A protein has these predicted regions:
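Acidic, metal-coordinating helix/loop segments flanking the phosphotransfer/catalytic sites
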Residues: 38-54, 62
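Conserved phosphotransfer cores of two-component systems
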Residues: 48-50, 74-82
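Short beta-strand elements of ligand-binding domains
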Residues: 58, 83-89
């Protein structure tokens, strides 16, 4: 009996109640273990409670940059090695320098999941 590879854990932070569960579902279908948060407080509580392979923060237009930057900075100050990515459009991507990676906002769920998977690839099996 072989032991299945560990699921990659993602903390998905998104303040949009309609989009968050859809993106969580897409990521779970791709094999990720997803915890999600609507608020900064909830995100930080979950962040401190367990280890994550990736903290994925949805940036909602230019108005969301400040929220995302503050959260990213707090996480990186506490744990510089933590991988953080923003989900955003190209314009927002040009205005930020905190995250390690950018996942472009996609209307195609498969492209979104593929973007995340390129940042946190599946574990190698022997």
């Amino acid at each position: 009996m072989s032991i299945p590879p560990a699921k990659r854990a993602i903390l998905h932070v998104c303040t949009r109640e309609t989009i968050r569960p859809l993106r969580d579902h897409v990521l779970r279908l791709k094999g990720f273990d997803v915890d999600s948060a609507l608020t900064k407080k909830d995100a930080l509580d979950k962040f401190w409670a367990r280890d994550y392979d990736l903290v994925l923060i949805d940036v909602e237009g230019e108005g969301g940059i400040q929220f995302a930057e503050k959260l990213c900075s707090e996480i990186k100050s506490a744990q510089p090695e933590q991988l953080v990515a923003f989900v955003c459009n190209w314009r927002v991507a040009n205005l930020t320098d905190c995250p390690d990676e950018i996942v472009r906002t996609e209307f195609d769920p498969a492209a979104f999941a593929d973007g995340v998977q390129s940042i946190v690839p599946p574990p190698q099996t022997n």
